[in-house]
Amino acid sequence: MALVHKLLRGTYFLRKFSKPTSALYPFLGIRFAEYSSSLQKPVASPGKASSQRKTEGDLQGDHQKEVALDITSSEEKPDVSFDKAIRDEAIYHFRLLKDEIVDHWRGPEGHPLHEVLLEQAKVVWQFRGKEDLDKWTVTSDKTIGGRSEVFLKMGKNNQSALLYGTLSSEAPQDGESTRSGYCAMISRIPRGAFERKMSYDWSQFNTLYLRVRGDGRPWMVNIKEDTDFFQRTNQMYSYFMFTRGGPYWQEVKIPFSKFFFSNRGRIRDVQHELPLDKISSIGFTLADKVDGPFFLEIDFIGVFTDPAHTEEFAYENSPELNPRLFK
């Protein structure tokens, strides 16, 4: 209720300051910030601008402390209602909060009811429009001076996502970097009501399920856990995905028990199981050192429970089997 009280009292700040600043973002939210930034100041016509300069010249020498000149007509003034914008922002976030409460109704054995009805299978990401692409971001070694390029767009008939580009392993000429050549596609961290950071709970599933079509290149599938510790931001769990090439789709099933633990791109000696109850994001990385064009088409990404897979962890990691790691 305190947050709602601050949100509804946002008009006090708007009346006190001439235009909203970044200090108001915690009260108004990102959507309202984008809305307010889209409002452009009206520009006077050349004729009116000259008349303004003439008026200002006539006012020189007067002993008026404050002079307010209205150079815009009533037709040019934008119809801005900050109260309405605040109400719309509050309604939007309360609608998200309602959806979160409904989605967390528990079913048999404590599992969400809609997942039980779907036989414990769930499509997490699918690509049927531009709003689905907005949930992802792409990056390459261009951020460190490399020459690789990567792009993401909708596939044919808007039924898939097409990740394509050119891979270049040429190291940047900066005198420091010795290796280069990677492209990646990473999902954005989900946000809930009032811009709260959310995570995915896949603890009732045991397999990652993808439907993809590639050009024969190997990809690295990376999963990151949700954490608030800065020291763990570079930690992830990875496994390989091999595409066949050709015009046919392939269904890829990767058990979560196969994902190995790494930090800053290096596989660690001490392995840990993937914490499925707090998944932050998933990504796909290409770094096979084969220069040239590439593509990867993705239909959907989901999770499901494979009853035939009973393995809990693929890597032996106990003090009895490897005491050197647990000294």
Swiss-Prot record:
Primary residence: mitochondrion
One of the GO BP terms on file: protein-containing complex assembly
Pfam families: CIA30
Chain segment of the transit peptide: 1-24
Post-translational modification Phosphoserine, affected residues: S318
Ranges annotated as biased composition (Basic and acidic residues): 53-63
Keyword Transit peptide applies: yes
GO cellular component, one term: cytosol
Annotated region (Disordered), positions in chain: 42-63
Single annotated GO MF: unfolded protein binding
Protein localization: Mitochondrion; Mitochondrion matrix
Tissue: Ubiquitous.
Keyword Transit peptide: yes
InterPro entries named among the record's database cross-references: Galactose-bd-like_sf (IPR008979), NADH-UbQ_OxRdtase-assoc_prot30 (IPR013857), NDUFAF1 (IPR039131)
Function comment: As part of the MCIA complex, involved in the assembly of the mitochondrial complex I.
Disease link: Mitochondrial complex I deficiency, nuclear type 11: A form of mitochondrial complex I deficiency, the most common biochemical signature of mitochondrial disorders, a group of highly heterogeneous conditions characterized by defective oxidative phosphorylation, which collectively affects 1 in 5-10000 live births. Clinical disorders have variable severity, ranging from lethal neonatal disease to adult-onset neurodegenerative disorders.
Family, per entry: Belongs to the CIA30 family.
Protein name: Complex I intermediate-associated protein 30, mitochondrial
Native species: Homo sapiens
